[in-house]
């Protein structure tokens, strides 16, 4: 027996639609019927502060980010790095992280992790100063 599923990311609801977060967050786990993994497509428009100055970390989850388009500016703890398309980034549990797009092209990235079946993220308010040139809110 062959068991597989195919879903186009744009056919999955953007959970940030209707909010002021600039960008898209499309979790594909349910649509694909994933049992052990979580997979989310994240799109960050040009010159946008996707997490709006906040950050987060996970207690147990190790995350894999796959940058497939654009260059993403990521912060891990006190370090800020530029991550170009074609890069893979592993982030260990308890590592504070956030990201924004300082470039002229939309960033597309995939966040992949094991599925716990419960929330594991802790938000960090005021993780880094908002970029004064970045869009902080979704266009109406």
Map each language-model feature to its residues.
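A short, N-terminal "cap"/entry segment at the start of jelly-roll beta-barrel domains
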Residues: 1-38, 45-46, 124-140
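A short beta-loop-beta micro-motif enriched in histidine and acidic residues
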Residues: 29-38, 49-63, 77
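Short, charged/polar surface micro-motifs in flexible loops or helix N-caps
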Residues: 35, 45-50, 71, 115
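Short, conserved beta-strand element in jelly-roll/cupin
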Residues: 41-45, 57-74, 112
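Structural motif
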Residues: 64, 71-73, 80, 96, ...
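Short beta-strand His + acidic residue motifs that chelate non-heme Fe in jelly-roll/DSBH
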Residues: 74-75, 91, 97-103
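Short acidic-glycine-tyrosine-enriched beta hairpin
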Residues: 78-93
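Double-stranded beta-helix
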Residues: 98-140
């Amino acid at each position: 027996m062959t068991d597989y599923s195919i879903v186009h990311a744009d056919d999955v609801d953007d959970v940030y639609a209707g909010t002021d977060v600039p960008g898209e967050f499309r979790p594909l786990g349910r649509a694909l019927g994933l049992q052990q993994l979580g997979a989310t497509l994240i799109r960050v428009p040009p010159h946008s502060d996707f997490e709006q100055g906040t950050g987060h970390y996970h207690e147990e989850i190790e995350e894999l980010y796959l940058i497939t388009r654009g260059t993403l500016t990521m912060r891990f703890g006190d370090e800020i790095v530029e991550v170009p398309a074609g890069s893979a980034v592993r982030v260990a549990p308890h590592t504070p992280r956030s990201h924004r797009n300082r470039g002229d092209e939309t960033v597309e990235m995939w966040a992949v992790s094991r599925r716990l079946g419960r929330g594991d993220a802790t938000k960090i308010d005021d993780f880094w100063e908002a970029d004064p040139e970045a869009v902080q809110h979704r266009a109406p």
